Structure formats: C-alpha cells, structure tokens
Amino acid sequence: ALDLETTGLDPARWRASWQRVVRFRGEKVLDTWSSLVNPQRRIPYQIQQLTGITQEEADGAPSLFSLLASLRQFAGRAPLVGHSIQFDLAFLARHGLFADNAALDTFELASILLPHMARYSLQRLAKELGISALTHHRALDDAHTTARLFQVLHDQAKRLNLATIQEIRRLGAGSNWPLTQFFEDVEREQSRTLFTTSIGQQLLARGVLNGRGSAQLFYQREEVEPPLQPAAQPRPLDTEALAAMLDEGGAFSRQFPGYEHRPQQVEMLRAVARAFNQHTHLLVEAGAGTGKSIAYLLPAAYFAATNSEHVVISTNTINLQDQLYHKDIPDLQRLLGIEFRAALLKGRRNYLCLRRLEALRRRGQLSPTVMRVLAKILVWLPSTLTGDRAEVFLPSAGERAVWGQVCSDPEACLGERCGYRQEGQCFFYEARRRAERAHLIVVNHALLLADIAVENRVLPDYGYLIIDEAHNLEDSVTRQLSFEADRQGLEEMLTSISQRVAPGRYVGLLTQLSFRLQPLLGQTLHSQATERIREVQQKVEGARSTLYDLFNGLRACLNDHRRPGQSYDQRLRLTGGMRAQPAWDEVEIAGDNFTLRLAGVVEGLRLLLEGLENLTECDLTSCEDLLQQLHLQGGQLYMAHEQLRPLLVEPRENTIYWATIHSQDQHISLHTAPLHVGELVEQYLFHPKRMIVLTSATLRAEGSFDYITERLHAWDAEQVALDSPFDYPSSTLLFLPADIPEPNQPHHQKRAEEALTLLCRAAGGRTLALFTSYSQLHNTARAIRRTLGEADISVFVQGQGTSRRQLLENFRTTPRSVLLGTSSFWEGVDVMGEALSCLVIAKLPFAVPTDPIFAARGETFDDPFRQYAVPQAILRFRQGFGRLIRSKTDRGIVLVLDRRVGTKFYGQAFLDSLPECTIRRGPIAQLPQVAREWLDRGP
C-alpha cells in the first residue's frame, strides 16, 4: 500500500514531498518504507497546512531520484494498493517507477462493493468501517489505513454471491479493467470448495439470470394494494385538531424532543387546511425556520388518507425531495394514527432498465469505464427495490454516460411488449405502480411539467397539488417548454435512420429493418417494403444536404453580429429587425427547404410504419425494437420540424427565438422558449386542479405578491405572508461599505477583493461569497487565494471541476474555509452553525440584459426595469440572503459589495425586502473589527 503527499495536483508542475509504503499480507504488516522527499521547489502554504510538512523539513530531505533504487527494491513486483492510486502513480511514473506492477484502487473498489456509502474519502470509509485512522494527510497513516481498508474490502467481496463475482469476472475478461484480476482471485477463493458448472448455469441456479439468460432482480415483487379510489364527497379536515398537534404539549412536542412551537407554522397549517376544505388556491410565503414542510404535509396526509386521494408534492431541488420522502414523511407516518402511503417518483432516466443492461452485458470488449459501472450495478442490484440511479455512486461524466446506456429511455422502451415489464421487473413502471396506490406522491417540477406535456400519462390522476420552492416555477416551465437544436444533433437523428456510405449503399435503422424483414415477408411484400424504405432513405439524404445549407447560411448571417474574441457564448435574438436584413433571406430560403424536406422524411416514415402495422398476417415480433426506434426517431423529427419551421420561416407571436454562437468551438445552436408562462400555468394547473398551494421563503417583491401573481396568473389564489421566527436583529449584521465604488466604476473589483479578504481573515474563513458571473468569481479567486492561504484559510471555487455537492461538503468539513459560488449557490445551500458565519453578496443579482428570454419578456412591460428587472432581482437577492441564518442559534454577517443599494433609487427596495436586522455602514477598514466584535458575542 502506498501514499504520497505532493505539492500540488498536477504531476507536470508539482512534486512529491513525502512517501510511505507498507508491505502487507492479509491483516499482517510485513514491513514499512517511509521518507520525506525534497520537492526542490516551494511548497504552497495551503499544502503545508493540509499535510503538516513544512518547507524547512522538505528542504532538508533527500530528492526522490536518490530514493528510487531503495523504493523500487522494497516494493518489488507486488501489487500496489492505494486510494485513488492513479494520482500517486502519475507522479511516480515520471521516474519510471512501478510501470509493471498491478494497481488496485481502494476508492474504486469501495464504490463498487459498498454502494450505499454516502462518501468515499479514505477518512470517511475508515470511520464508517471501524478502521482506526490516525492523522489525515500524513502519508504514514494513510498508507496503513489503505492497507487495512483493502483487507476489509477483500472480505466484503468474498461475501458477495459467487454468481455475481463470476459475472463481473467474465465481463472484465474482455476488457482492460485493472480490477479484473482482483475479482478472479476472489472467485478462486470462493470456488475452492464449490463444484462449478458453466457461468450461465450457476447464474440461473442462483436466480441471477432468468430463463432468457438475462440478468434479473433478486427480490420478489412486492404485493401492492389496488390504486386509490377517491371518495365521492371529500370529508373536510378538522383544522383545530391538526393545529393542536403543533401546540406546546401537543403530539409533535411529545414525539420529537426539542420540538419548538412556532405560531407561523400553525398559521400556515390552518391556511393549507382551509384550501383543502374549500378547494381554493393558495400562495404562502413562509420565512426560513417556519417549518413549512410539516405545515403542508400534515393536512395533506390527513386529507389524502381520509378521502383516498392523491396529493402531489413538487419540489425544485433533490435535497428537498429527499428531505420530504426520507425524513419528514416517515416522521409523520410514525406519529399519526392513520395509515397513509407515500411514493417518490422521478424522471424515467433515473431508473435502471434491465433489458438495456442485458444488451450492454452482451456487447463484449467493454472499456474500463463501462466495466466499472457494470460492476457497481451488479453488486447493487440485489439490494435495490427502486433501481434509482441516486443509489449508485457515479461521480464522473464518463460513468454517467454509461448510465445513459442502461437507464429507462422512452426511445428504447418496448412498453407492454417487454418481458421484464410483463414479469413486474421494470423499475420505472413499478415506481409508477407504487404511485398509483400512494396518498402522497413526491416529484420534482420537471416531472410535474413533463406529465402535463404528455397529457397526464406519467402521474396518476390527481386534483390536489402542493408546489414547494414555487419561486422557481416560472423558470421550470420555461425550461420544460424550451427547444434547442444544432446541426450535429439533427444530423445524428437523420443518420440513425439512414446514411448513404456509397452509391446505392446505405446503413442505419432502415437498412437493418430491410434485412430483418426479408425472411418474414413474401417476395412481393418484401419488394414493396424495400421500395418504400428506399424512398425514405432518399428523402433523408435530401434533408441532410439542405441541413448543411441552412447552417452555412446561418453562420454567414450571424457573423455580422457576433463580437469577436469573446470567451463566453454569444446569444443573438432573432427579432423582426434581424429577419428584415438581406442576409436573413438566404437563411429563410434554406430553412424553408430544410423543413419541407424534413416533413417529407416524417411523412415517409409514417407511411412505411403504417403499412407494416397493417400486415396483420405477418409476424413482425422480431422487428419490434427497430420499429419502436423508427417510431421514436420519427416523433423527434416531427417535433424538430414543428419548432424549426416557425423559428426559421413563420415566427409565432408568443415565442422567443434566438441563436447561440458557442465560444468553445464556434458551433451554432437554435433555440425557442415561451414568451408568456402564466397563461400556460393557468390553463394546465390552476383551472383543472381543485386546489394548489404554492409556497416558498421568497414569493414577495417589495412587500407584495403582485409580481409572482402576474408571472404565474395566480389571480384567484389566497395570499398569506408569514415572517420568519428567527431573531434577525440579534443574529444578523448587515454591513454596507461606504467607500466601495459602484460595480461599473474603476477600482470596484480591487476594493471588493480587499473587503472579502479582510472579512475572511477576521472570521477565520467560514464565508460563502455569492457572485453573478463566473468572470468576477474567478478573478476574485485568483486575487485572494494566496493571501488567504498564508492565513491558513482554504478557498473552494465553483467551476474548477469539483461538483457542487463536493464543494459544499468540503466547505462544511474544512474549519477555516471560504466558498466562492455563483448561479445555483444562491439557493439550496443549507449550512448550519459556525461553518457559515459570513455571507458576501458581490453584486445585486440582476439578469443579464442581453439574455434573450429576459429581454423579450421585459419588452412586454411599460417600465421593464422597474416592473420586471427589479422584482426579479429582489427575489434572487432574498434567496441569497437566506443562506446565512438556518437555525435559531445561527449568527453571522452579510456583506453587500454593491453600493447601488445606497445610491440608486431602487436600492432601498432591496434592503426593505430583507428581514429587519442590524445594519452598519462604514469604511471597509472598519470591517474586520466590526466582524470580530459581532461574531464574538455569540448567539
């Protein structure tokens, strides 16, 4: 087992500073080798703090070159074990070390063998598995811990079903996967006392395969009750009885120690219960700490259970979805004296498809990434009841791409013809079946809106809906109804149907269908089908040629409007003014030609497929998969035609059109989005549903619901605003620098960096800084990292390859740290306690004026800035502010680095939108003392 400490992450730039190797057999350590290494360069201060290795220690150590012979002799040809070992080997490979040694990665092994772990860092695994780990990030201790972890994982592998091990070994044999030998060794150990037959027979005998030789589930299909049958006349809720449960001394205080009675929570519960009883719609703004989830879940559960009704609860974020389904609802189920069922339903691509998994298993010659994902799935499969991707650790884009090959996908689904669905082993349809019998159905906004788009074919019929995080609803509807296309995507759709590779020679789905039909149809019928197929193939080639003309014309037209040398994507609205220019004429002609050819392909496919469906005397079962794919490709091309024809030739009044020139490769994409969302929400949600509750901590702008009401057409909804129970005057200091320039003035960035640095040093890190652009974020990160590093403060930065979840985890668990984020970090961040004591808002979060959707919608107002831009920014500002105080004991500082809150006519509206808190104005130089005094007071 080996571990290195290094001066940085890039082997080409940085060097090893300490190395430790442990030789072991089983649980016995045979020998150790350890040495500090002189990196022959400066060790960054942050790395010194992380590893505990000082510059003086490293300068007095031998060079790695002088240690090579000793290290090579010690390790010999033994297999090497390490946690994320490829990182260590990349440094050692520069010196020709260990090129021929087998390498076993305990990080990869743990992610396969322990699928239900929350995190896979060496220290977290050691803690969860009871392995005594010493000081983190000292190579001596990490190497010993890794050796012990490997033995624990080896023992875990031996406890797997032998058939699972054999299947992983069989699949790995045809790949270059480093862990194949590990599973071969485990199989050999397990098989010593077992008489083995063929792999297929073993899998069949152990229930891993079904009679078709396909992987199947390891659990019996659960017995479920029939779908709910709503009561003819709903029984009203007893509002007073429900409210009493939340009173001091009520059911909640008896069941949950530490429960606090909150009048705001009771008031919200009464409003929600009233909406259920009166079948009215409701807008509820409930400040942080109200406990709004219990305030709506309690009446929802009682109403649904009493009346055998479905109540759908929709959230915007996965975090809230998980909180509701895995914590709040189970708490209610334990507390309440009634039985009610809940289901969590996600988009279908979150569910494993066993038929597609089987197809991937049979492919052969699998890459190491594919093998890694297959091993994870095969180990996880016996324990899952849901087939939900969230239960499998897939950290890389490559692994998530492999999931895309095995997940449930409408383009590959055989529906009722699928054997797995017939046997009750389709995870997606089983999830839908559970939803049909559930009283509470938890979904996200995307699935809620997708159900509307497909005319309610995803969710069971329901009349009661609660939308949490409702401030995101307009954006969610916009995303759901938006369209995007580029040349590559359109060409791939056409190519999947057919592509001419030589005169008279084609490949693609149509060619496969022709070959598949030959033995199934008589000569005459096959000749007719082949002729129809050839007609469609020719239409595809015609569409392909005009596709090139279209995008060449677009490039020529848009080149006159692009700004050269920009490092970001440029979005250009396709307005009437743009279309009136002479250069657009060529685009319109090419667009007309392409969409007409595209319509010809769609019609040709329709006639071909209808003709084959009418051949009732022929058994075309063996062609079902090809026919299904052609149906779906035809449907996608039809949708593309329906969007592109108006975009290019016949624009519609209520649609926004734009083109994006992508900075990375300069390719062009075309986009559409709805101009007015409120009319759609009114038509498809408010009108058909009996009751809808929309709730969030931020629904009001400038003290009024007018903005959100107008955006969502929630004209008839009752409005309830509840303040937070938190004591903001005592817990929150709002500091407004008096000597910082406005954002568009010289020296603003320099002064903002200075203020942020002073605050972080005074607070010892513990700071979340929110930005409105990646450009400012990265400029700030470069400016402050060194200074804060010298103060032993770590800086975590969004957009540098680390996931949002990992950034938050690093921030929570690193005592002296700062997190710089934009976009998604303005909401959904929930860090309680001293880990987050300071919040910095770099700029007021106005939308980018050139954003096509923002610009087009702004034009519908008499005063776009005051009526649209300001209210929208205020809601975002309030969301950001809400990241600081998450509990009654939290205490902290909000620093706003945008002087416009005090100098512009609209600035006071931003301040007035916040809870009443302590405000200090003063020069930046006073900030450190003010911060220390405020934070030292304690809660």
Question: Where is each model-derived feature located?
Answer:
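Signature of the SF2 helicase/ATPase Hel1-core->accessory helical subdomain module
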Residues: 296, 322, 412-440, 444-596, ...
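A substrate-engagement module of RecA-like helicase motors
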Residues: 223-232, 239-250, 308-439, 508-534, ...
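A contiguous, basic/glycine-rich beta-loop/short-helix subdomain that forms a polymer-engagement track
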Residues: 404-439, 449-456, 598-740, 747-754, ...
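Conserved RecA-like P-loop NTPase helicase motor core
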Residues: 737-747, 799-904
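Conserved pre-motif I regulatory segment
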Residues: 236-284
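Conserved non-catalytic scaffold segment of RNase H-like nuclease domains
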Residues: 1-102, 115-137
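Acidic, Mg2+-coordinating catalytic module of metal-dependent nucleases/exonucleases
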Residues: 79-95, 117, 121-189, 894
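Acidic two-metal-ion nuclease catalytic site recognized across multiple nuclease folds
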Residues: 151-238, 927
